[in-house]
UniProtKB/Swiss-Prot annotation:
Its main location: cytoplasm. GO terms for cellular component: cytoplasm. GO terms for molecular function: glutamate-1-semialdehyde 2,1-aminomutase activity; pyridoxal phosphate binding; transaminase activity. The gene is hemL. This is Glutamate-1-semialdehyde 2,1-aminomutase. Homodimer. Disulfide bonds: none annotated.
């Protein structure tokens, strides 16, 4: 039995059975709590800023289903819209007006996007973008950054973040060398390394893809001039710049990181928030590039459930909620309060810590820092984070079960939630 102060009998029973049914007992690796130890909790239902497990325990949630729940779980407006949409059917496999509506909203919001294609996941969006980059430039090599995660497709599983970082895997078995031979890597925030790669591979690099704010190696922000430098380098070498905004899109600003930092890429991938909690992905960018996608052009990409009416409905309603005056000001205020409070408590209880936030995204590392890249993140005290995570969980706060994942707030979080979280963090950090 797990040593815990909360009742987890049903969670343990369900997870034990799950391990005989699914690899590791989960449908995605990080959910197994491997890097933080202890027993995963099994959810029963969610509402607003809170989750309840099958044993009846309630938690303040800072995972938000890994990002989509920016308006809070099961928002009544989203649920109401979905009920109406369900009456018309769950999937058409044909064009629907809802695709037009969400496409217009995305194009109006994201500076780089003149045309958009909807898919079913962030991984799918990044796979399609990679193919499109290579087709448009007629080049094969792509630069990615250590610790940046662009889904689980073969060509991106090179020094990746997210679950790969959580499990300590440098790469994944089963990925042939040929699949990654054209994937070049550089440390995040290191422009000189990128310059060297361009110099060594002149006229061979199709583009650069990155999380403009890293959320899959913990929360890491771009140094001043880094994004601008990438924009200049890609222009100079005839390569494309791609922002993977699956996590940051509509979260750190309505127009994403590119609006926040004033740097416009050529292509952008999206997901999470634009589906309002349903499976979704999207990629878009300049019209001349996107016009190469079939059936308008020769670059093939397709999907049975792409643009399905339920995901489109949830996405439309979520973006409507985010358009309300004061939404992002509120997210900035409560997230700053949380991030500053956690750092202050860590320092006052004698722990070396660093971290920060941008709008509704935050992170905390147990190291004096600063953390500029994946190597810095790996040098933080992950064992201490595991103890911190468990202590918070046992006292009713659900944080991402990995040091290498960002945290998320929502419009449903209240000042009382933040105050309670900081108070609990003080209690936990005073005891570890």
């Amino acid at each position: 039995m797990v040593n815990t102060t909360i009742k987890t009998t049903k969670s343990q029973e369900i997870f034990a059975a799950a391990q005989n049914l699914m690899p590791g007992g989960v449908s995605s690796p990080v959910r197994a709590f491997k890097s933080v130890g202890g027993q995963p909790i099994v959810f029963d239902h969610v509402k607003g800023a809170y989750i309840w497990d099958v044993d009846g325990n309630q938690y303040i949630d800072y995972v938000g289903t890994w990002g989509p729940a920016i308006c809070g779980h099961a928002h009544p407006d989203v649920i109401g819209a979905l009920h109406e949409a369900l009456e018309k059917g769950t999937s058409f496999g044909a064009p629907s007006f809802l695709e037009n509506v969400l496409a217009e909203m995305v194009i109006a919001a994201v500076p780089s996007i003149e045309m958009v294609r909807f898919v079913n996941s962030g991984t799918e969006a990044c796979m399609a973008v990679l193919r499109l980059m290579r087709a448009f430039t007629n080049r094969e090599k792509v630069i990615k950054f250590e610790g940046c995660y662009h889904g689980h497709a073969d060509m991106f599983l090179v020094k990746a973040g997210s679950g790969v970082a959580t499990l300590g895997l440098p790469d994944s078995p089963g990925v042939p060398k040929s699949a990654t031979s054209s994937t070049l890597t550089a440390p995040y925030n290191d422009l000189e390394a990128v310059k060297a790669l361009f110099a060594e591979n002149r006229d061979q690099i199709a583009g650069v893809i990155l999380e403009p704010v890293v959320g899959n190696a913990g929360f890491i922000t771009p140094d001043a001039g880094f994004l601008e430098g990438l924009r200049e380098l890609t222009h100079e070498h005839g390569a494309l710049l791609v922002f993977d905004e699956v996590m940051t899109g509509f979260r750190i600003a309505y127009g994403g990181a590119q609006e926040k930092f004033g740097v416009t890429p050529d292509l952008t991938t999206l997901g999470k928030v634009i589906g309002g909690g349903l499976p979704v992905g999207a990629y878009g960018g300049r019209r001349d590039i996107m016009s190469m996608i079939a059936p308008a052009g020769p670059v093939y990409q397709a999907g049975t459930l792409s643009g399905n009416p339920l995901a489109m409905t949830a996405g439309i309603k979520t973006l409507e909620l985010l358009q309300k005056p004061g939404a992002y000001e509120y997210l900035e205020r409560i997230t700053k309060k949380l991030a500053d409070g956690l750092l202050q408590v860590a320092q006052e209880t004698g722990h070396a810590a660093c971290g920060g936030h941008i709008s509704a995204m935050f992170g905390l590392f147990f190291t004096s820092g600063p953390v500029h890249n994946y190597e810095d993140a790996k040098n933080s005290d992950t064992a201490k984070f595991g103890r911190f995570h468990r202590g918070m969980l046992e006292r009713g706060v659900y944080l991402a079960p990995s040091q290498f994942e960002a945290g998320f707030t929502s419009l449903a979080h209240t000042d009382e939630d933040i105050d309670q979280t900081i108070a609990i963090a003080r209690e936990v950090l005073s005891s570890i």
